[in-house]
């Protein structure tokens, strides 16, 4: 469900693209992250179904925090695009509204990065458990 929500958000944001602002990355981040979440769930399902591991609270919370982080990230990008923030325009003087929306985007990105690293740690622990019992 989380995967479909973000994929759908990416599709809806695509309807609002009207130039070369940061609405474009908001669209493709929504679409690709939706697929990424689906693949994360698939990896967890493999560990649970084929290697008889229990679903940990960490798995559940990692998916939730990754989704929330990316949703904030995408919202910040779309919000900034609504104010006309251009892509790849370094050194531009930003208004306070743009700084706030880009800060929102950055905060969501940071949450998603930390959660993505958590995914790697969880997967490595699962591989360790598999090799430990062989």
Summary of predicted features, one role per range:
Residues 1-134:
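Hydrophobic alpha-helical transmembrane segments of multi-pass integral membrane proteins
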